[in-house]
Swiss-Prot record:
Disulfide bonds: none
Entry keyword set: Ribonucleoprotein, Ribosomal protein, RNA-binding, rRNA-binding
Protein's name according to its UniProt entry: Small ribosomal subunit protein uS3
GO CC annotation: cytosolic small ribosomal subunit
NCBIfam families: rpsC_bact
Main function: Binds the lower part of the 30S subunit head. Binds mRNA in the 70S ribosome, positioning it for translation.
Length: 283
């Protein structure tokens, strides 16, 4: 189940929160939801070069507050705040209520799943090899503190006629653990051969619903829980201790008779140089 479901939707109300936070009755719900979809599509097109990771929309009483998380806040704000004012007026006209726009900076864009997916998509559109782009993104994420990352690309990779999927993983990515903080991102690369989809999962550690960090497992505890592993990462059987030569498998009970020793009967030797067996000597 954890392998197929959307990681963010699977963890809602546990460790993750909704991207649209407002309440509406039955008569206004469809209208407000449609406005949210239009706003997100507009921001995705308008701020295509601003490296926007996610957008949160809140609707207090007869107002709207939009928080934009970007690794390049200067591109969103513009020179002397001109671009942000144009953006506010466009969003106010679109939503029909006063809109307040907040800009939050993403400190580590190399560990943000959505930014990683967008970066790989841009590289594929520039005809960079998909394996090189994926492995470079994984190395940067692990170097900056991610505990695990998985990247999957699907489509006509390298222009082949039959579409296929390829994925790479480094570290741990526990998709079925609810307390695991999994960041998920999706991007599309529009190449001359067609659209290539990129999915990214980034594991940033465990987090409890209360916000308290969980108890860290030591290396010995993790080995006892998971068992020893081989060099290729697959589980293996526990090593068996070598039995000393001549030592019985189990200790005999006191006073018990010694175990009988099994002796294999030897076959009679074949006749050598025409010798006759002893049984046939008198015939």
């Amino acid at each position: 189940m954890g392998q197929k479901i959307h990681p963010t939707g699977f963890r809602l109300s546990v460790t993750r929160n909704w991207a649209s936070r407002w309440y509406a009755g039955n008569s206004n719900f469809a209208t407000m939801l449609n406005e949210d979809l239009k706003v997100r599509a507009y921001l995705k097109t308008k701020l295509k070069n601003a490296s926007v990771g996610r957008v949160i929309i809140e609707r207090p009483a007869k107002n709207a507050r939009i928080t934009i998380y970007s690794s390049r806040p200067g591109v969103v704000i513009g020179k002397k705040g001109e671009d942000i004012e144009v953006l506010k007026s466009a969003l106010t006209k679109m939503m029909g209520v006063p809109v307040h726009v907040n800009i939050e900076e993403i400190r580590k864009p190399e560990t943000d799943a959505q930014l990683i997916a967008d970066s790989i998509a841009q590289q594929l559109e520039k005809r960079i090899m998909f394996r090189r782009a994926m492995k470079r993104a994984m190395q940067n994420a692990m170097r900056l503190g991610a505990q695990g990352i998985k990247i999957m690309s699907s489509g006509r990779l390298n222009g082949i006629e039959i579409a296929r999927k390829e994925w790479y993983r480094e570290g741990r990515v526990p998709l079925h653990t609810l307390r695991a903080e999994i960041d998920y991102g999706f991007g599309e690369a529009e190449t001359t051969y067609g659209i290539i989809g990129i999915k990214v999962w980034v594991y940033k550690g465990d987090r409890l619903p209360s916000g308290e960090p969980p108890v860290d497992l030591t290396k010995e505890d993790d080995t006892k829980r998971r068992g020893p592993r081989r060099d290729d990462g697959k589980p293996s059987s526990r090593p068996r201790t070598a039995r000393p030569e001549g030592q019985p498998g189990a200790a005999a009970a006191p006073g018990a008779a010694p175990a009988a020793k099994r002796v294999r009967a030897k076959k009679p030797d074949a006749a050598v140089d025409g010798a006759v067996p002893a049984e046939k000597a008198g015939e």
